[in-house]
Amino acid sequence: GISEVLPGHYLVCRENSVKDICYWKLKSHPHEDSFEKTVEKTAWLVEDSVKKQMLSDIPISTFLSGGVDSSLVTAICASELKKQGKILNTFSFDFAENQKYFKANSFQPSQDRPWVEKMVEYCGTNHRYLECDNRDLIKNLFRAVDARDLPCMADVESSMLYFCSKVVGYNTVSYTHLTLPTT
């Protein structure tokens, strides 16, 4: 079978052997900060990380699902751009006729749109809703697998590829997830 090289590992391949070597491993340490210090430090790390990623010589945008992560990134970016007299472009994505056929479940207990609308109003962003239908998903399915180079969740990967291809027509730099620095 085919196995994936794990994060933090590399392979040494010789004529008759393959050796898996771990070069990095996350180390856990006891958390000793107070609740207040933890909140302060986390807020600083998140805000600092987003601000550093905003450095661009072209307009930026964010993907806004209405969830905690994208809402946090959007709020920070919108606030920083307002200081420069600029308005943040935001994008959200939905499936055609989702409002008609949506069924709540444990993975997605509610539709995204009401939360997106609250964040757009709160942050004062220039927002665009983008949609795709089943044909769009099917057209992008094999491209999504090729891009990922791994098997994937068909609708998620295919829709994200489609979504990104549409957003690039408006903005070429868009943020959605955080990469926090280590201390």
Language-model-derived ranges and their functions:
Residues E15, K25-L180:
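ATP-dependent adenylate-handling active sites, centered on carboxylate activation for C-N bond formation
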Residues T183:
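Extended, polar beta-sheet/loop recognition surfaces of beta-rich domains
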